A protein has these predicted regions:
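Regulatory and interdomain segments flanking nucleotide-handling catalytic cores
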Residues: 1-567
Length: 567
């Protein structure tokens, strides 16, 4: 149809679907979630941005939860006490808050949107205020600059609401409504961000009006952008929070949402957010830490300050398998609350108990962290990483090894990275490794060893077969991995073990090699690795083809050689 001279296209789905603002009758349960319109949260390419994005999501969820509680609604999930909303927001309360909220009763989508926008406004205005105070001479109050920030303040998020007389129906209603998105993406003139390429580069004159008298001058724009980011980098580094790696490299050119993700982790900006959020509340703060504050990342540089020696680090990204499906299977509110509490308790315990590095965020079913030696001059060994991965699975399963403590299985990507691998590449490798672990059947770990030249070797295995690396024994009864690594290379060179592109595939030699080195103290034939692998090949390798079985064995040896070798 045509309205006011403009064509309006309406799909069949939109005709049949109730608008987001229209509430469902006889609603006993409400489910709320939200998403950024441009995906700027999940497209983080720096560790600091990833942390900032995680905290933004958690903080906005907390605002919605508190809004529901303030109106007398019972929040079923996430599990949160009344005091957690009465008290000031802090890292301990907010971190790991999921952005899917289940509420008992008919909670308005408009109220959820208002609560989210209140929290987002606090974040945006804190960033604007800091820029205005620290870059006064750059005229950051330019009308175009203000216009751009206002657009992102209004159009950054979309809220989805589902309702039903049962929890399962409310969840289904939410998924249906998510199919129809009604967001508006802010438009812009000029060049796009150097990180994502999706949005305009943020700088004071980014949205100046182009007229006949005020023609666009690309050379002048570039000079203004360079000047802005040089000044911004200097202001961030000169604010009594010395940090490595630096908050901002002057060569980076960020969009407004990318800049917000970076700024919220700065101690001055996080304090401003805290102040704006609580300026009208009489609260005893105590010793709680502001929501977005984080210590510096200097220990993640992978280089010893004194000796200049470099070292490898482990990066892990884990996620519970089919959590949404598990939630739908829980029909009683108390079961959902119990599951939510278990996830949050696990994430809190995991974060506080991790001694081999730092957990950047832990939301219960999803977490991300970095493994490194906390003692100067002592390098973290790859074998230590394997031991930790084995123990992680045990911790996730809980005391009863025959069932999952949390009701869901775990998929994880682990990256062992050389010191010269750029941080953005490491994060991408983590995402790919986790995705691969899920795609091959879930309940798996993918270990990827990334070298400084960008090449890598990897191995994906169900968790319980990770311990096979510990069963290695060389021809002399030791643990020298060069024996099996050398034999593998020799057999491949002679085509005794075919390449993955060979027409004829026979796994017999590869299985014999597995038995030769990984059957220490095994007497029963049924317990031989070759027989276990052959009998359970589809489950273990994700395929019944010989070439995939050969590749699985080869990958295990390559990864074991890199992480467990004593030479």
């Amino acid at each position: 149809m045509r309205v006011g001279g403009k064509a309006i296209v309406t799909t069949a789905l939109q005709i049949n679907e109730k608008p987001q603002t229209q509430e469902t009758k006889d609603v006993k349960y409400t489910v709320i979630t939200f998403a950024p319109v441009q995906g700027f949260i999940e497209k983080s390419r720096k560790l600091r941005d990833l942390y900032g994005a995680s905290q933004i999501l958690s903080y906005l969820s907390w605002k919605i939860v508190c809004a529901a509680k303030s109106k007398g609604f019972d929040v079923i999930s996430p599990a949160i006490s009344e005091d957690d909303c009465i008290n000031v927001a802090s890292v301990d309360i907010v971190q790991g808050m999921p952005n899917r909220i289940l509420i008992k009763g008919d909670f308005s989508g408009n109220d959820a949107h208002q609560a989210l926008m209140e929290g987002w406004k606090e974040i945006v205005e804190a960033c604007r205020k800091w820029l205005g105070e620290n870059l006064e001479d750059l005229k950051t109050d330019d009308s175009g600059w203000a216009r751009s920030w206002t657009r992102w303040k209004i159009h950054a998020w979309e809220v989805f609401r589902g309702g039903g007389d049962k929890i399962e129906k409310a969840m289904q209603d939410l998924e249906t409504r998510k199919l129809r998105r009604g967001w508006t993406v802010p438009n812009w003139n000029g060049e796009s961000s150097s990180l994502s390429g999706h949005d305009a580069i943020a700088y004071p004159n980014m949205d100046r009006e182009i007229t006949h008298e005020n023609k666009r001058n690309e050379s002048r724009e570039r000079e203004e952008i360079i000047n802005f980011y040089e000044r911004l980098a200097a202001a961030l580094e000169g604010s009594k929070q010395k940090d490595e790696p630096k908050y901002l490299d002057p060569s980076e050119k960020l969009s407004i949402p990318e800049l917000i993700k970076r700024l919220v982790t700065h101690h001055q900006v996080s304090t401003l957010v805290d102040r704006l959020a609580n300026e009208n509340r009489v609260i005893k703060r105590g010793d709680s830490q502001p929501v977005f504050r984080i210590d510096n990342f200097s220990e993640l540089l992978r280089k010893d300050d004194e000796s200049g020696e470099t070292y490898w680090t482990g990066w892990f990204m884990g996620d519970g398998d089919e959590v949404g499906k598990h939630l739908k299977s829980l029909t009683k509110p108390e079961d959902v609350t119990g599951f939510s509490k278990s996830l949050r308790d696990w994430g809190d315990k995991f974060q506080k108990g991790f001694k081999l590095g730092r957990v950047v965020y832990a939301g219960g079913d999803d977490f991300f962290g970095v493994m490194y030696s906390q003692q100067k001059g002592i390098k973290l060994k790859g074998a230590d990483a394997i031991d930790w991965l084995i123990k992680l699975r045990e911790d996730w399963r809980g005391e009863d090894k025959n069932s999952e403590q949390l009701g869901v299985k775990l998929s994880l990507g682990f990256v062992w990275a050389g010191h010269s691998v750029p941080q953005r590449d490491v994060l991408q490798h983590c995402r790919e490794a986790e995705k691969l672990a899920k795609s091959l059947g879930r309940d798996r770990v993918t270990i990827r060893v990334v070298f400084n030249n960008g090449q890598y070797v990897q191995w994906t295995t169900p968790w319980k077969y990770l311990e096979w690396l510990k069963d290695y024994s060389d021809r002399e009864g030791g643990t020298n991995w060069s024996h099996v690594y050398g034999d593998l290379a020799h057999l491949k060179a002679r085509h005794a073990i075919p390449s993955k592109n060979a027409v004829r595939q026979d796994s017999a030699i590869a299985l014999a090699l597995l038995d030769l080195y990984f059957n220490q103290n095994v007497i029963d034939d049924k317990l031989k690795k070759s027989n276990i692998l052959s009998a359970n090949q589809p489950e273990i390798t994700g395929s019944s083809k010989d070439k995939d079985l050969i590749q699985w064995i080869e990958n295990m040896i390559n990864v074991g050689w890199q992480l467990c070798s004593i030479t």
